[in-house]
Amino acid sequence: MNNQNRGMSLIELMIVVAIIGIIGAVAYPSYMATVIKTRKTDGIAMINKVMQAQERYFVNNLSYTTNLKDDLGFAANSLPSEEGAYLISAEACGGGIAECVNITAVAQGSQDTGTPADDDLELNSQGTKAGKWPNDH
């Protein structure tokens, strides 16, 4: 009598599914954290682009501006970043718009984890950063 086992038993299959589930449960949060950190470069790039335009405007007008559309030539006063992960805007710092401008990048969509201190980014014309920038510890 030739009695060969072919295939897998239900228990073996359940063990494989459980192992895959455990690996997925460990890997997915780490993957999402990496994606969120990587998308911050999208917001940072747009903040830098707006800040460069602000500095050019300051050289000519001796003041910064919150009007990104009319004064700096952007499409709107609240700009989406290139990949849409952030919404960029400008506002006067505490000392007034003539002295300082603050560029804010507010996380959008899946980039918004519900913790603005971690998600949103800010940079003012004096070089002060707020939020959790990459490489900040």
Regions from the PLM with identified roles:
Residues 59-137:
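Periplasmic/extracellular, small/polar-rich flexible segments of pilin-like filament-forming proteins
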Residues 17, 44, 51:
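Conserved catalytic core of two-component sensor histidine kinases
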Residues 5, 34-41, 45, 96, ...:
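Residues at secondary-structure transition points
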Residues 27, 34, 54:
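Conserved alpha-helical elements of the SDR catalytic core
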Residues 1-31:
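N-terminal single-pass transmembrane signal-anchor helix
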Residues 10-13, 54, 105:
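Conserved hydrophobic beta-strand within the GNAT/NAT acetyltransferase core sheet
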Residues 37, 41, 49-70:
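Alpha-helix exit/C-cap motif
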